Design a protein with these regions (language model features):
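Substrate-binding cleft of extracellular glycoside hydrolase catalytic domains
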Residues: 123-125, 132-211
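C-terminal motif of bacterial Sec signal peptides marking the signal peptidase cleavage site
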Residues: 15-18
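Active-site beta-loop-alpha junctions enriched in small/polar residues
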Residues: 96-98, 140-144, 182-184, 211-213, ...
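Bacterial N-terminal signal peptides that target proteins for export
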Residues: 1-7
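Alpha/beta catalytic barrel-like cores
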Residues: 20-156, 273-277, 291-299, 303-345
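Acidic, His- and aromatic-enriched active-site or binding-groove loops in soluble protein domains
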Residues: 162-163, 196-210, 231-235, 276-291
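Substrate-binding surface in catalytic domains of secreted glycosidases
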Residues: 210-250
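Aromatic-lined carbohydrate-recognition surfaces of secreted/lumenal glycan-active proteins
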Residues: 183-188, 246-264
Length: 345
């Protein structure tokens, strides 16, 4: 596992960097998705409470018989009531509406894409009857660029009306939404704060992609090398998100971080866990099954943070990897830990 491929996509005059890397070594209320499972025995006007017994049971279930002591993660705080995880498995279509090459979200027109997503959700619910699967639209709201732009930041922020479109689509199918950010040569916190009005909604969550964070790589052009984000940068955003949760009386925010190499997040052990957040480390490398499982083992299983995610590529895991099909749901459910967030690109 010693090679990495970085693909830069030129789409509509923009450089859109996709997470197409070879592996190495909205308006539906999100609390309705999680709280129905998380909250037990309360009257209509009662203050929500967390079903900690069910939470513990599901966390042990996700550990999948691990005897190493890594999973479930020790000393993690219980989430605030209304938490989506581990009461639900998130099944997400990822992409950008300006590109049909960055992921499933954008690859097909809405009328074709939505039924495909819901079919994947149903198949996941059928494959794992213990944890309900729910749909998500995971939108790349800030994309890394191959040119510096007017401010020299090598990133492009999508117009708000694009995100409004995604929120409207999500409302139609009771899906949650992720805003995903590739910062280029910008700083992480201000790029996240740019979308505060959306992150203040209960059904909108955050994803960040260290692959295209270039400040820790000498400020080189995104796509030339794999980028990096430190735990300190991640924690700064975590503190900000936790503040939004408290200020707006929201259920916990999911905070998803892409990872397929050690250097993308060199110090995951220092990521701070908070009741207001649910941290998902998403293994998003592509390739044949043995390569993907190895990457998952090294950077997810052996370096636990809180929750685990797994990305599947409709094209890169098959045509570009010499495989007839992607890894099956049964194969993924056999991993330790079981991934609770599934992303399709």
């Amino acid at each position: 596992m010693n090679k990495n491929s970085i693909f830069a996509l030129v789409v509509s005059g923009l450089f859109l960097a996709s997470c197409s890397n070879n592996s190495e070594g909205a308006a539906s209320a999100s609390d309705s998705a999680g709280a129905n499972s998380a909250v037990a025995g309360q009257s209509k006007n009662a203050k929500p409470t967390l079903d900690t017994a069910r939470y513990n049971q599901l966390m042990n279930y996700l550990a999948n018989g691990d005897t190493s002591g890594r999973w479930p993660v020790k000393n993690a705080p219980y989430p605030l009531p209304g938490a989506i995880l581990p009461f639900n498995r998130v099944v997400a279509y990822y992409g950008n509406l300006f590109s049909n090459r960055m992921g499933a979200l954008g690859k097909w027109p809405k009328a074709e894409m939505i039924p495909k997503l819901l079919d994947e959700v149903k198949k996941w619910s059928d494959a794992d009857s213990v944890i309900k699967s729910i749909p998500s639209l995971h939108y790349i709201a800030t994309t890394a660029q191959g040119t510096p732009g007017k401010d020299g930041k090598y990133r492009y922020r999508m117009p708000y009306n694009q995100i409004d479109t995604i929120l409207n689509w999500a409302k139609e199918i009771n899906a949650i939404v992720f805003i995903d950010i590739q910062i280029g040569l910008s700083d992480l916190l201000p790029e996240v704060q740019y979308f505060e009005k959306y992150l203040s909604l209960p059904n909108v969550h955050l994803g960040v992609d260290p692959e295209f964070a270039m400040n820790g790589k000498g400020g080189v052009r995104p796509g030339s090398v794999i980028g990096t984000l430190s735990a300190a940068e991640i924690n700064q955003v975590g503190e900000y998100l936790a503040g939004l949760v408290q200020k707006n009386n929201l259920p916990p925010k999911m905070f998803m971080i892409h990872r397929f190499t050690k250097g993308m997040v060199p110090d995951p052990q220092n990521i701070k866990l908070r009741p207001e957040l649910q941290i998902v480390m998403d293994m998003d490398g592509w390739g044949p099954p043995d390569l993907k499982k190895g990457t998952y083992r090294y950077w997810i299983y052996e370096q636990p943070v809180q929750f685990a995610g797994f990305k599947l590529f409709y094209v890169n895991d098959t045509e570009k990897s010499g495989q007839k099909e992607m890894m099956s749901r049964e194969q993924l459910l056999g991993l330790k830990p079981k991934p609770i967030y599934i992303q399709y690109q």
